[in-house]
Amino acid sequence: MAGAKEIRSKIASVQNTQKITKAMEMVAASKMRKSQDRMAASRPYAETMRKVIGHLANGNLEYKHPYLEERDVKRVGYLVVSTDCGLCGGLNINLFKKLLADMKAWSDKGVQCELAMIGSKGVSFFNSVGGNVVAQVTGMGDNPSLSELIGPVKVMLQAYDEGRLDKLYIVSNKFINTMSQVPTITQLLPLPASEDDDLKRTAWDYLYEPDPKALLDTLLRRYVESQVYQGVVENLASEQAARMVAMKAATDNGGSLIKELQLVYNKARQASITQELTEIVSGAAAV
């Protein structure tokens, strides 16, 4: 029965793990709903800012802000949003693969890349592969604030202001639904012109008070900050959804494994009983 005892021990171990994954699935489901609420609350502001900036990028402005001007590209920067925790399926690695492919495309053109990381998984991954990480922030928890994110944003904006970066992108997962999260790379600077046909057909005239430079400096920085914050809350909702799905799959796989082990245990026990009966019958026949 040594084999049967070993199998019983494995079954108990899988059952304990199954309880943990089931609990993590339920926690992730609860956190996902809260993350979706935050994402839905901030999305209108981010989208409105994007529309306003789209008007500016399409317009003929009396003052041309540096954030609106295309440059010869020698260095590009990425604000990379990843998770602080694992156990969320392929969410991070799919994002990193997309980013590495984009970085390689720039590298083949002789363009250098700098990375500002939001989330510990991105920090550890790109440090291990030799990425040029110039800023990082980790441990933001389940309710990140803009003040926690502002460090890497300031570093990249300062580099852009000083001409050390010619393009700036944000890299994050876009939440579609519980089963679908899409890795995206979105250009922040220089500001891309709006792709909305209605905006392209509309002529916009702006009056600036008191000064266009001061107003645009503030507005365009707010735009970048809003897009980064939206990327973070969308990535957080994606993380919880991916973790919930991964933990459900682990729980289901645990159930299947328990059934297989139970079948093996029953066969081992049956074989042991058969052997004992055979020995008893053989002994009786010998007598």
From Swiss-Prot:
GO BP terms, alphabetized: proton motive force-driven plasma membrane ATP synthesis
Pfam families assigned to the protein according to its UniProt record, in alphabetical order: ATP-synt
Taxonomic source organism: Salmonella typhi
Known function: Produces ATP from ADP in the presence of a proton gradient across the membrane. The gamma chain is believed to be important in regulating ATPase activity and the flow of protons through the CF(0) complex.
UniProt name for this protein: ATP synthase gamma chain
UniProt entry keywords in alphabetical sequence: ATP synthesis, Cell inner membrane, Cell membrane, CF(1), Hydrogen ion transport, Ion transport, Membrane, Transport
Subunit structure, as described in the record: F-type ATPases have 2 components, CF(1) - the catalytic core - and CF(0) - the membrane proton channel. CF(1) has five subunits: alpha(3), beta(3), gamma(1), delta(1), epsilon(1). CF(0) has three main subunits: a, b and c.
Highest classification ranks of the organism: Bacteria, Pseudomonadati, Pseudomonadota, Gammaproteobacteria, Enterobacterales
Transport found in the keyword field: yes
Xref: NCBIfam families: ATPsyn_F1gamma, PRK05621.1-1
Family in the record: Belongs to the ATPase gamma chain family.
GO MF annotations in UniProt: ATP binding; proton-transporting ATP synthase activity, rotational mechanism
One cellular-component annotation, GO: plasma membrane
Bilayer-crossing regions: none
Key word Cell membrane present: yes
Primary location recorded for the protein, binned into one broad class: membrane
InterPro entries in the cross-refs: ATP_synth_F1_ATPase_gsu, ATP_synth_F1_gsu, ATP_synth_F1_gsu_CS
Superkingdom of source: Bacteria
Places the protein is found: Cell inner membrane
Membrane protein topology class: Peripheral membrane protein
